[in-house]
Design a protein with these regions (language model features):
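Class I SAM-dependent methyltransferase SAM/SAH-binding core
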Residues: 1-27
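Short amphipathic alpha-helix with an adjacent loop that forms part of the alpha/beta core around
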Residues: 26-37
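A conserved beta-strand element that flanks and buttresses the S-adenosyl-L-methionine
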Residues: 39-42
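Hydrophobic adenine-recognition pocket in adenosine-nucleotide-binding enzymes
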Residues: 46
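A short glycine-rich, Lys/Arg-flanked "PGG" loop and its adjoining helix->strand segment in the class I
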Residues: 54-71
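Short, glycine-/aromatic-enriched active-site segment of Class I SAM-dependent methyltransferases
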Residues: 72-95, 99-102, 106
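Conserved S-adenosyl-L-methionine
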Residues: 111-122
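Flexible, glycine-/basic-rich loop-and-beta segments that form/coincide
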Residues: 122-173
Length: 185
């Protein structure tokens, strides 16, 4: 695998082949020079921290073949907004996602969404586990994905009104927290 953290040392001790670098196009080529195309790629709670999403998606498209499966878990924007989960937002996260923009991003690099699961408790709160594959693969996009993207549009994913509602909910929650703190002291 490809693992940029110190965890790669433990992986190598268990005789698992890995490259200790950040994932980018150059690293994907380095991987392919040494190993076969992967059957499964798992990416858990990393997507929000990636600063160059085009490079990331291009690299994924480069490293997979028609039998590869990509599994990405990330905090789901609609859950965060609907539930007012402002406490899940922090400085290391550069972006929060719904399926709609990710579909556009990955399709630019020949990758399709094939399915997803909603998780009430992912690595950092409510999340989506998204399954992706090469466009010309053995996989097809499920109706579930198509319906969810339609739902996101109907919900107003592209409308500022939804984000203003999140701001209002956040301010109300902060006000309640301040009242509780004031009553306690």
């Amino acid at each position: 695998g490809i693992e940029p953290s110190d965890a790669s040392k433990h992986i190598k001790q268990k005789r698992i082949k890995s490259i200790n670098k950040f994932f980018c196009y150059k690293t994907s080529n380095e991987y392919l020079d040494k190993y076969e195309k992967p059957k499964i790629i798992t990416i858990t709670n990393v997507l929000a921290q990636i600063d160059n999403l085009n490079e990331f998606a291009k690299s994924l498209g480069n490293i997979i073949d028609e039998k590869s499966l990509i599994i990405i878990e990330f905090p789901y924007l609609l859950h965060m907004i609907n539930r007012g989960l402002f406490d899940l937002i922090y400085h290391e996260h550069l972006s929060y996602f719904s399926l709609t923009p990710l579909k556009l991003l990955f399709e630019k690099f020949g990758i399709i969404m094939i399915n997803f699961e909603k998780l009430d408790l992912g690595a950092s709160g409510p999340a989506i586990r998204l399954f992706l594959a090469k466009k010309d693969s053995v996989y097809q996009t499920s109706n579930k994905v198509v319906k969810q993207i339609k739902y996101e549009k109907k919900w107003g994913i592209e409308k500022i009104k939804r984000y203003n509602t999140f701001e209002k909910i956040t301010k109300e929650k902060i006000s309640k927290i301040k009242k509780i703190i004031y009553l306690k002291y």
